[in-house]
A protein has these predicted regions:
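Active-site microenvironment of metallo-dependent hydrolases
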Residues: 1-39, 44, 103, 292-308, ...
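Divalent-metal coordination cores built from histidine and acidic residues
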Residues: 2-4, 9-12, 95-206, 533-535
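Active-site beta-loop-alpha junctions enriched in small/polar residues
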Residues: 86-88, 114-116, 144-149, 180-185, ...
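Short acidic, glycine/serine/threonine-rich loops at helix termini
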Residues: 53, 120-124, 150-157, 189-193, ...
């Protein structure tokens, strides 16, 4: 904080100059004092400069203000901070994402854009940063730490420690910290490149490294925490979360679209509520239809409260705990950077709530003192797209480069006892089965789409055989999945975490081929009897739509109806279900372009 800014804040805090906005008759959610108390809050230049509690501070008088907002007894809470998320998973660009989440009370998003980085490298990250600048809420971008997710993954880019350091030097302050460290073997083995990437975080404003450690325990967890990784959002049972808390890590309780872990983890907090101070919320991956209908971090608060967690504690986890995890809550710094509580010297990110049930969107949402949403409607401003953003967006189009494929590639037999992915609905983890028959199974394929297969095919990989058959086991993985009950057709997507190759699941070869052909330049496609019955176009990198959140939500809802009619039953989400099946950093069995991969042993499974 400069001396000039400090003096300005002090003058306003002392009441010697008028403030911009004074919130009166509020029930203030005090996350420091863990209480709700009546009072008023003064804001000047986007910063909270004064908090006066009724009774205790009556002798202090009040603030002169340009605008007085009578809260009429409503609750005034700090804006929510989403501790870990992937904007691309909502299938919309950053400015549109900000418009969507602001209506639900998210005023800060800690975004890891490793999805677009796996497709377009650092140019993809630059697009996210520049497009995000158009938004009134605060988006803090983390540098993707694992592009690709594993060293030999067939992604569209590679980002090394040296690349990170060069980007930090060229774009100082644009990247907040280092994103989730998914290369667990690299950490455990003290791999020099992995360690260099972790060390690169020291060039960022937060100097923090986010984590990703599903089922990690014992000495491996000790090594992970000792490396300086501050948080994890992958815990699925209380014992796992407590292991991480006890090693000094923050635990993010995830409540997304595919993964619903919060209720399962809540017993750890009910057993000892003091643990909540080191716990926060993350959505990770959230579909627009869910965001618009049930919310984002406000939804996590509701789930927590329904599980028995005190509302003030839930709000604290949604704000202060996350701010503390990333060092955003204290220090003699620019007050526009400090947040997580209603207290002097903090950014004026505020929620005006009718009650503390979170059954609906906040009555009003303020970001840096400016009204951005009211009763679920965005009323803020999104800046126009400038030439640089438009140019970066244009580079993300036409990202799907698939080889030529014949029907023979999709038509293969089941081998009794072979490794089969066992879907776990509502969870990112999968199981591994070895059934003796194909009853109840569906074919699954992963086709590299970043140009490797195209190049190898041009070199004669297929020989005189059917198109694409020479790529099987190299750039086309084939296998079987149980629990993905699509009937009479196929589903395909250009989203396949984290390298985003084309994944297709179906019960017959012809529809699987038709679905892959229909993917075009990106999106989700549902094919039945050779016809496309539902589609969500994702032109930007094959990950993001150029439409609104409402457009994508409507397409998603139609897709869901058609998918349910084809036998994909709840609780399995057909889209979130398929896009995580290739993810090679979460146990147990996954599909890669080379074949079926056992994450627990890091070997290919026959």
């Amino acid at each position: 904080m400069s001396v000039e800014v400090m003096r300005s804040v002090i003058e306003a805090a002392e009441g010697r100059v008028p403030v911009d906005t004074l919130f009166t008759n509020a029930q203030i959610v005090d996350v420091y004092g863990q209480r709700v108390a009546p009072g008023s809050v003064a804001v000047k230049d986007g910063v909270i400069v004064g908090v006066l509690y009724d009774g205790r501070d009556d002798a202090a008088g009040t603030y002169e203000a340009t605008e007085v907002v009578d809260c009429q007894g409503r609750y005034l809470a700090p804006g929510f901070i989403d501790g870990h998320l992937h904007i691309e998973s909502s299938n919309i660009r950053p400015a549109e994402y900000a418009r969507m989440v602001a209506t639900r009370g998210t005023t800060t998003a800690i975004a890891d854009s490793h999805e677009i980085a796996n497709v377009a490298g650092l140019d993809g990250l630059r697009f996210m940063i520049e497009d995000g600048r158009r938004a009134p809420i605060s988006i803090k971008y983390m540098m993707p730490s694992c592009v690709p997710a594993l060293p030999d993954e067939q992604a569209g880019a590679v980002i090394t420690a040296a690349d990170m350091q060069a980007f930090f030097a060229e774009h100082p302050g644009d990247v907040f910290g280092l994103g989730e460290m998914m290369n667990l073997p690299g950490v455990f083995m003290a791999d020099p490149e992995t360690c260099a990437r972790i060390d690169a975080a020291n060039q960022t404003p937060s100097k923090q490294v986010d984590g990703h450690a599903p089922l990690v325990a014992g000495m491996d967890l000790n090594a992970y925490a000792a490396a300086g990784i501050i948080a994890d959002h992958e815990s699925t049972i209380p014992e796992e979360a407590l292991d991480k808390l006890s090693r000094g890590m923050y635990v993010m309780l995830r409540e997304g679209t595919c993964s619903h872990d919060l209720a399962n983890l809540s017993p750890m907090l009910l057993e000892n509520p003091a643990r909540a101070r080191r716990c926060c919320f993350a959505t990770d991956d959230r579909a627009p239809s869910d965001a618009l209908s049930t919310g984002m971090i406000d939804n996590a608060c509701r789930v927590a409260i329904e599980a028995g967690i005190d509302p003030v504690v839930a709000i604290s986890m949604a704000s202060l705990s996350t701010a503390e995890a990333f060092g955003l809550d204290h220090g003699c710094r620019d007050p526009h950077e400090l947040r997580g509580a209603i207290a002097p010297g903090k950014r004026a990110d505020l929620l005006l709530l009718d009650d503390l049930t979170f059954a609906k969107a906040p009555h009003r949402v303020y970001a840096a003192g400016a009204l951005v949403a009211q009763d679920g409607t965005f009323v803020g401003e999104i800046a126009p797209e400038m030439a640089e953003v438009a140019a970066l967006a244009d580079e993300l189009r036409a990202s799907v480069k698939l080889p030529k494929l014949s029907l023979d590639v999709f038509d293969y037999a089941f081998k009794p006892g072979e490794a089969v992915i066992d879907v776990v609905p509502g969870k990112a983890i999968t199981g591994m089965a070895r059934p003796e028959s194909a009853e109840g199974l569906r074919r699954i394929m992963l086709i590299e789409r970043h140009g490797r297969g195209v190049s190898l095919q041009a070199e004669g990989a297929d020989g005189d055989g059917p198109a694409g058959l020479g790529l099987v086991g190299k750039h086309i993985g084939r296998g079987w999945v149980r629990g993905f009950t699509i009937t009479g057709g196929a589903i395909a997507s250009t989203i396949g975490h984290d390298s985003h190759n084309v994944c297709v699941v179906g019960d017959n070869a012809a529809d699987m081929m038709a679905a892959v052909e229909a993917v075009g330049q990106g999106g989700h496609v549902l094919v039945r009897d050779g016809e496309v019955v539902a589609r969500i176009p994702l032109a930007l990198g094959g990950l993001m739509s150029e439409g609104t959140a409402e457009d994508v939500a409507a397409q998603h809802d139609d897709f869901m109806v058609k998918a349910r009619a084809m036998g994909i039953e709840p609780p399995l989400d057909p889209i979130m279900g398929i896009i995580f099946l290739p993810l090679p950093v979460i146990p147990t069995l996954r599909i890669r372009p080379e074949g079926m991969f056992d994450v627990t042993t890091f070997t290919y499974a026959d």
